[in-house]
């Protein structure tokens, strides 16, 4: 499944991890899961990223969201590297599993291959890909960063909150949205349905087109 993208079902891979063997669909279960790859163990940007993800792990856990890291190094390398990650920012614990994928099969199927980066032997490396997978095993959101650019974990959390809010209330979230702020009502929802669904009411932006498509409401 080299073209894995939004709306696709992730393959039910059998994976070797720092927590033992898992099947991906079983791991997802009824939860949302953040699947994220890093190019290599014992590298600078990856160390800061994994440390930061460990720092945010409690926030994801509060939301019932699981974390699953991916790299091409083996399990023993991952376990040794975790010691460095935890020492870099004392008090942060890497409690989530990290997949070992030395044959590159998992990252190929999850569309995480970097076309430009290679290891010293010329082997393929993953880019900084991140997929948020829903309970239906479908990709709900993807980020794709090059090896030179670390991801923003605060934005990953914000985007996760937006997805969860949209799924729970059947709404959409506007630009720069944060939890607690107003959401927008999708165009396919009539005013009559909106009145029934949103007891707090809604506000329609007055625009030069006189089209009533930008409607804001508040949800819990």
From Swiss-Prot:
CC annotations in GO: cytosol; nucleus
Pfam families membership: 1-cysPrx_C, AhpC-TSA
Entry annotation: catalytic residues: 46 (cysteine sulfenic acid (-soh) intermediate)
KW Cytoplasm (keyword) present: yes
Locus of motif Bipartite nuclear localization signal: 195-218
Keywords: Antioxidant, Cytoplasm, Nucleus, Oxidoreductase, Peroxidase, Redox-active center
Residue runs in coiled coils: none
Enzyme Commission no: 1.11.1.24
GO molecular function: peroxidase activity; thioredoxin-dependent peroxiredoxin activity
Transmembrane segments: none
Residues in Thioredoxin domain copies: 4-165
InterPro entries the record matches: AhpC/TSA, Peroxiredoxin_AhpC-typ, Peroxiredoxin_C, PRX_1cys, Thioredoxin-like_sf, Thioredoxin_domain
Top EC class for this record: oxidoreductase
Catalytic activity: a hydroperoxide + [thioredoxin]-dithiol = an alcohol + [thioredoxin]-disulfide + H2O
Entry keyword annotation includes Chloroplast: no
Any GO BP annotation: cell redox homeostasis
Matching CDD domains: PRX_1cys (cd03016)
UniProt-annotated location(s): Nucleus; Cytoplasm
Function: Thiol-specific peroxidase that catalyzes the reduction of hydrogen peroxide and organic hydroperoxides to water and alcohols, respectively. Seems to contribute to the inhibition of germination during stress.
Family, as annotated: Belongs to the peroxiredoxin family. Prx6 subfamily.
Miscellaneous: The active site is a conserved redox-active cysteine residue, the peroxidatic cysteine (C(P)), which makes the nucleophilic attack on the peroxide substrate. The peroxide oxidizes the C(P)-SH to cysteine sulfenic acid (C(P)-SOH), which then reacts with another cysteine residue, the resolving cysteine (C(R)), to form a disulfide bridge. The disulfide is subsequently reduced by an appropriate electron donor to complete the catalytic cycle. In this 1-Cys peroxiredoxin, no C(R) is present and C(P) instead forms a disulfide with a cysteine from another protein or with a small thiol molecule.
Designated name of the protein: 1-Cys peroxiredoxin B
